[in-house]
Regions:
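All-alpha RGS (Regulator of G-protein Signaling) helical domain and cognate RGS-like helical scaffolds
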Residues: 93, 126-141, 145-151
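Generic beta-sheet signal
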Residues: 46-48, 157-163
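Glycine-rich phosphate-binding loop signature in dinucleotide/nucleotide-binding domains
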Residues: 96, 151-156
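A short acidic-Thr-Gly-centered motif at the start of a beta-strand
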Residues: 40-42, 150-153
Length: 202
């Protein structure tokens, strides 16, 4: 399912951004530790890297927004675009290739996924639950849990999802920053486990 994007046409090579320099030493050291843990889990497989979309100014979409029209939605800032490219660069530098890249239908999620990995597969279950009937949100959450359980049973393979803070909060019972990824897996009882976090500097 193709969804509109707010991104201008862009050569593929522009997505291969390298990680920014000039970070504080303490931040680098902390990031390196989580980096190593997440990489090992992704390489082993049986997990999902679920990212909150990259930086997009504002809190909620404007009244009357439409999914098919990016101009009516919150969109990525320039910093957010750089952040999304850095996510892709991190995976590319480590030769980590997701088996599947899925995205919420919202433009800021589609754009985050596109800048990082190329055009994603759009999945309604990853969409924001705000403004939707409670029954719809509950059904989507069941879909996500089922998909995570399936992904967790496939060693040597991982998926990447791009979604929203509220979705990740409902699914994993934790908060996330813009552009942050949670490495998730389901245990044998189907419970969702956060086994690592990944915050990649822009």
């Amino acid at each position: 399912m193709a969804m509109p994007s707010s991104l201008p046409p862009e050569p593929r090579i522009a997505r291969r951004a390298v990680l920014g320099a000039g970070l504080a030493f303490a931040s680098l050291r902390s990031w390196a530790a989580q980096d190593t843990g997440a990489e090992a889990l992704l390489r082993k497989g049986g997990v999902v890297a679920a990212f909150r979309h990259a930086l997009a100014p504002g809190t909620f979409d404007p009244p009357g927004f439409r999914l098919g029209d990016c101009s009516t939605q919150r969109n990525l800032s320039e910093e957010g675009r750089a952040q999304a490219r850095s996510v892709g660069a991190w995976f590319q530098q480590r030769q980590l290739q997701p088996g599947k890249v899925l995205s919420s239908p919202w433009c800021r999620c589609v754009d985050s996924a596109t800048l990082a990995f190329g055009t994603p597969q759009v999945w309604a279950a990853l969409g924001s639950p705000r403004g939707s009937p409670e029954t719809t949100g509950a059904a989507h959450l069941r879909e996500l849990r089922t998909a995570l359980a399936t992904a967790s049973s496939q060693p040597g393979r991982f998926e990447v999802w791009f979604t929203h803070m509220f979705v990740l909060s409902d699914l994993a019972n934790t908060n996330t920053s813009s552009g942050e990824g949670l490495i998730l897996r389901a245990d044998r009882s189907g419970n969702v486990e956060v086994v690592a976090r990944l915050s990649i500097p822009a």
